[in-house]
Amino acid sequence: MWFKQISFYPLNKEKLPEADVLADKLAEAEFTHCQGLDWFSEGFTAPVSFSPELVFPADFTLRVALKKEEKVLPAGVIRDILEEKVAEIQNNEARNVGRKEKQELKEQITDDLLPRAFTRSSRTEAVFNTRHGYLLVNNAASAKAENILTKLREALGGLEASLPNTKQSPSSLMTGWLLQGHCEGGFELDSDCELKGTGDIVPVVKVSKQDLTADEVVQHVKNGKTVTRLGLVWREQIAFILTQDFTLKRIQYLDVLQEEAESNGDDAAGLAFASQILMAESVSTMLEELVSYLGGWQD
């Protein structure tokens, strides 16, 4: 239930859907399995295992999930069958098979195999935080995050969401914090970072499980490298990697949050309810503090 990586989008809090409206709209775009000659199928599915509902509400949060099912048809399988058919035609009819005919044969083979192909599925989850006005997506890959945002917009007929563009870049802030040897506010340096230089061949330095205030680490910044990833700890509650794209990776929710969730959840539903609220509130509060050190949002 706890997101391990996050992309997020600021939302217009005045135009967020109610839980029942969101559920009705998502029902019109519900997931169905791949049929016949379809290569993939995509739609909304239940975000929790103990309920068939398409929206899991918890106080000021709404959880949704997008499922994608894809046919798995290895190119090598198609190629082998095609070669067999081409050889059969050449032997039986004593003629060559041209490029156009090979393409037609390939399409016929694909159409024949698709209905019987294996499938693989994946899902992307997101939580609406209606109190803070954020959409938190459980994926740091921009393509995956933007895809669920697009599907939500299509289902709702629009959703006012923007990219998290701040006045100062995350890379600039991270570089400054590493250079000065400490962070601001509730943030502390952890033990991992990545730095990049400039030039035709960009040098990359990865630091893992080391003291980030050590001279040999700081010297990379003094030599002109910028920080692209930085391990941080926020108020002894969350440890994470901040990236230059303003995504969060390798998120760890420390004991204080885990214990609070467990104390408020007597069963699977109760634990999911408490965990969702605590995750959304702590992450959103942390993001707001981080945004303040980044100079606020761009106009």
Curated annotation (Swiss-Prot):
Keyword terms, alphabetized: Cytoplasm, DNA recombination
Segments traversing the membrane: none
Organism domain of life: Bacteria
Statement: the UniProt record of this protein carries the keyword Repeat: no
Pfam families for this protein: RdgC
Family, similarity comment: Belongs to the RdgC family.
Designated name of the protein: Recombination-associated protein RdgC
